[in-house]
């Protein structure tokens, strides 16, 4: 049974994870989950604020303090805003405005290695930008093709793909699985949930 510590009050974000139970003690957790909400404040990644960015610096700093408590043998999982937060905590930046992703529906993503295709929910207007990191510090596992008509934000260059699920493995920090979509919003029978659970099982320290 995997123990999950959800950062903040939105405990339902973890409901799609198989064979898990919630814990209110972070030190007991196998998985520490960061949830959705406001944009991450650009000051955390050294960027100027885009006109569309709305953030809560108090929340960011509180969650940064939680992230710094996570042990190397615990897996961080980020959902939507949480995925972007984990990108920033690992030294990445954010695209502060994109189009055709805040659709409140699903769109196709594909595996970088095998090209396998899945549907994922999409409710966001910002996006992870890990491409400023060293290649060994991250791996884009799943992506979408260039759905957006633009990629706006301070210091953003061309995106080879649109990152949807990214694994961060920066030395001295916990492994982080950053999922842009909302698995908790998907139908329980959705095959994408099985794929995501396989990723969880792969990276949780036994």
Where are each of the predicted segments found?
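Short amphipathic alpha-helical face segments that pack within enzyme cores
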Residues: 12, 85, 102-106
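Gly/Ala-rich beta-loop-alpha elbow adjacent to hydrolase catalytic centers
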Residues: 78, 82, 87
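Glycine-rich nucleotide phosphate-binding loop and flanking beta-alpha elements
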Residues: 39-41, 83, 128, 185
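Amide-donor transfer/coupling interface in amidating biosynthetic enzymes
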Residues: 9, 16-18, 27, 34, ...
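Flexible gly/pro-rich beta->alpha loop and the following alpha-helix that scaffold active-site loops
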Residues: 18-77, 90-91, 95
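Short, charged N-terminal beta->alpha structural module
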Residues: 1-21
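A short local structural element in Rossmann-fold oxidoreductases
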Residues: 87, 95, 129
């Amino acid at each position: 049974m995997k123990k999950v510590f959800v950062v903040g009050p939105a405990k339902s974000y973890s409901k799609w994870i198989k064979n898990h139970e919630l814990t209110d003690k972070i030190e007991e957790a196998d998985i520490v989950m960061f949830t959705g909400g406001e944009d991450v404040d650009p000051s955390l990644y050294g960027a100027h604020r885009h006109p569309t960015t709305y953030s809560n610096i108090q929340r960011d700093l509180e969650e940064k303090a939680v992230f710094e408590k996570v042990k190397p043998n615990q897996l961080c999982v980020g959902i939507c805003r949480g995925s972007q937060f984990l990108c920033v905590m690992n030294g990445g930046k954010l695209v502060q405005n994109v189009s055709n992703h805040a659709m409140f529906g699903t769109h196709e993503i594909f595996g970088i290695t095998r090209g396998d295709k899945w549907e994922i929910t999409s409710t966001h207007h910002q996006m992870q930008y890990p491409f400023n990191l060293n290649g060994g510090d991250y791996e884009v596992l799943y992506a979408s093709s260039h759905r957006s008509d633009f990629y706006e934000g301070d210091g953003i260059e061309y995106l080879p793909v649109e990152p949807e699920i990214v694994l961060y493995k920066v030395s001295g920090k916990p492994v982080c699985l950053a999922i842009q979509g909302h698995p908790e919003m998907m139908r329980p029978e959705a095959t994408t949930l099985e794929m995501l659970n396989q990723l969880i099982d792969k990276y949780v320290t036994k």
